[in-house]
Amino acid sequence: MSKRHSAKYKIDRRMGENLWGRPKSPVNSRSYGPGQHGQRRKSKVSDFGLQLRAKQKLKGYYGNLTEKQFSRTYEEAARRKGNTSENLIALLESRLDAIVYRAKFVPTVFAARQFVNHGHVTVNGKRVNIPSYRCKAGDVIQVREKSRNMALVLEAVASNERDFAEYVSVDAKSLSATFVRAPELSEVPYPVKMEPNLVVEFYAS
């Protein structure tokens, strides 16, 4: 198990929010950060602090991406025409592991990364094992036949914990999903408020 995977709930505690809306999140029972000093009185946060927090929260939500992975995604978003904030979200939601998570083939975004890494998914009939693989509108993502009876898949498919995203069309019988289009920020079913505009300010400062 990777350090990023094992530390997933530390991200919740550090942010003081239940990032994925999971019943097991420690934030449901306490709202302070990890460590013995978690309950200290909060001081006023600077603009830079707010921007950094917004970046850390978005990085954490997508499986605690490395700074290199996240900054590269931001740079691509900035190069594209249009609103950089919206471009950033569209790129993050176009990741193969994000779509596997949105399709509810697995219970968590961390599990989605491992699931893809271990070769359990195809894109347009070809096996792809790169979590950051960028999907395009119309791409069909499917769980490989030999992987469909895995416990975590059956658990996720049966769960009502999360809603489906409108931009991912799912066929539960064949365990396939079509990436309809890259979404706008307002369409993404985040359990908490995300502020990509502050992320843009962070990198622009």
UniProtKB/Swiss-Prot annotation:
Transmembrane helix in keyword set: no
Taxon lineage: Bacteria, Pseudomonadati, Pseudomonadota, Alphaproteobacteria, Caulobacterales
GO biological process: ribosomal small subunit biogenesis; translation
Residues of the S4 RNA-binding domain: 94-154
Gene (UniProt): rpsD
Protein name as it appears in the record: Small ribosomal subunit protein uS4
Subunit structure: Part of the 30S ribosomal subunit. Contacts protein S5. The interaction surface between S4 and S5 is involved in control of translational fidelity.
Pfam family, one: S4
Keywords: Ribonucleoprotein, Ribosomal protein, RNA-binding, rRNA-binding
Xref: Gene3D superfamilies: Ribosomal Protein S4 Delta 41, Chain A, domain 1, RNA-binding S4 domain
UniProt cross-references to CDD domains, sorted A to Z: S4
Role noted for this protein: One of the primary rRNA binding proteins, it binds directly to 16S rRNA where it nucleates assembly of the body of the 30S subunit. With S5 and S12 plays an important role in translational accuracy.
GO molecular function: rRNA binding; structural constituent of ribosome
Signal peptide range: none
Family according to the record: Belongs to the universal ribosomal protein uS4 family.
Location of the region described as Disordered in the Swiss-Prot/TrEMBL record: 1-46
GO cellular component: small ribosomal subunit
InterPro entries the record matches: Ribosomal_uS4, Ribosomal_uS4_bac-type, Ribosomal_uS4_CS, Ribosomal_uS4_N, S4_RNA-bd, S4_RNA-bd_sf
